[in-house]
């Protein structure tokens, strides 16, 4: 009995699942635990995210209202905010020279 060695077969080898051979190549297995965790639903998180979304929508509505009021008071500011800034000096690009390099044909 002293000579018997107990070998435990664990699904993890070296801290990760063993590779599977498919088509002559070794492919690492995906962990099934991660898949199960993704499919489980937590009802508590859904409720908090729904209330957070409602709060975000309300704040965005409040901001839109204030921006509308300001745009009526200052229409030029709202108009300029949507335009691209124009440079004071136009940049003149020099014409590019076309360099033709004569090369022998490939046979």
UniProtKB/Swiss-Prot annotation:
GO MF assignments: ribosome binding; translation initiation factor binding; translation repressor activity
Stored Pfam families: DAP
GO BP terms in the entry: apoptotic signaling pathway; cell differentiation; negative regulation of autophagy; negative regulation of CD8-positive, alpha-beta T cell activation; ribosome hibernation
InterPro entries: DAP1/DAPL1 (IPR024130)
UniProt entry keywords in alphabetical sequence: Apoptosis, Differentiation
Segments of this protein annotated with the region Disordered: 1-26
Signal peptide coordinates: none
Tissue: Detected in the corneal epithelium, and only in trace amounts in the liver, bladder, brain, heart, and stomach.
Function: May play a role in the early stages of epithelial differentiation or in apoptosis.
The protein's name: Death-associated protein-like 1
Organism, scientific name: Bos taurus
Taxonomy of the source species: Eukaryota, Metazoa, Chordata, Craniata, Vertebrata
